[in-house]
């Protein structure tokens, strides 16, 4: 798996903005990506030292359109803890 295939997009929410000030960055990642692959991808793409990586599965929600019910797709989220004094500049400006 290529590094650009592992990290799909940053998650930009109020909670992720609060975590960013603590040196933690939230990313949407590939469903089959492991912690080691995520750590290597973030290091290669952004040039930072990753101390820790927390991964969780976000389950899809039930949605209803008129009389039909369905589900949204689930996805995988990673919270990456960056070494003290380092930051991902691209996300700081977002």
Swiss-Prot record:
Family per similarity comment: Belongs to the universal ribosomal protein uL23 family.
Signal peptide: none
UniProt source species: Treponema pallidum (strain Nichols)
GO molecular function: rRNA binding; structural constituent of ribosome
Origin: domain of life: Bacteria
Keywords, in A-Z order: Ribonucleoprotein, Ribosomal protein, RNA-binding, rRNA-binding
Gene3D superfamilies documented for this protein: 3.30.70.330
Quaternary structure (record): Part of the 50S ribosomal subunit. Contacts protein L29, and trigger factor when it is bound to the ribosome.
GO cellular component: ribonucleoprotein complex; ribosome
Pfam families according to UniProt: Ribosomal_L23
Annotated protein name in UniProt: Large ribosomal subunit protein uL23
Annotated InterPro entries: Nucleotide-bd_a/b_plait_sf (IPR012677), Ribosomal_uL23-like (IPR013025), Ribosomal_uL23/eL15/eS24_sf (IPR012678)
Entry's Gene Ontology BP terms: translation
Function: One of the early assembly proteins it binds 23S rRNA. One of the proteins that surrounds the polypeptide exit tunnel on the outside of the ribosome. Forms the main docking site for trigger factor binding to the ribosome.
Coiled coil: none
